[in-house]
Amino acid sequence: LHYDVMDGHFVPNISFGAPVLECLHKALPEVFYDVHLMISHPLQYAEPFIKAGASLYNFHLECEDDIQQTIDAVKALGCKVGLTIKPGTAPEALEPYLDQLDLVLVMSVEPGFGGQKFMPSALDKLRWLKAEKDRRGLKFLLEVDGGVDAATAPQCVAAGADVLVAGSAIFGAADPAAAVRAMAAL
């Protein structure tokens, strides 16, 4: 389950916190919780979210905290770690951290609002990251989020994406279960 966290500062919207995640985790402990933190200071929230049930703590390269210190803190808490890049950030900026990551998320829209149109430039980023992953023998998963639908999902998979985040395409579909099945079949 991709769980978006927004602080009203890094992005304009505000969403769920650690207490809601804790309730979800208690009700559905078998679910993998990919916690995507669109927040300015992910370091200070690592422990509360991981204790609440985060399976993967996924924060933005563009945050205000020290990236290495945050990665180290998440790993010390026994959690998988991911880094996310916004549409305006080059994938090469992730190079110093790639060998420490369990997941890299490429945003294909500006973070903070659902229902936006997919930015095709994300495909080049996915291709570069997939090539770098293969060249270096790394194991991180590649995830894409934003504007992913029946038309863009196959392009993302072809570019190297392992994980697709599709909110509006699923929850706005006449038959959400069929939309999930169609994407899972890719």
Language-model segment annotations:
Residues 1-20, 61, 109-117:
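Glycine-rich, proline-tolerant flexible connector loops at the mouths of alpha/beta enzymes
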Residues 4, 49, 104, 129, ...:
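Conserved, mostly hydrophobic/aromatic
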Residues 6-8, 38-42, 62-64, 86-88, ...:
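Active-site beta-loop-alpha junctions enriched in small/polar residues
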Residues 9-42, 46, 153-170:
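A short alpha/beta connector and helix-capping loop motif
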Residues 14-35, 73-84, 122-142, 146, ...:
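Alpha-helix-loop-beta-strand connector modules within alpha/beta enzyme cores
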Residues 43-51, 89-101, 146-164:
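Catalytic cores of alpha/beta
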Residues 44-45, 54-141:
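Conserved anion-binding
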Residues 157, 169-186:
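C-terminal helical cap(s) of enzyme catalytic domains, especially alpha/beta-barrels
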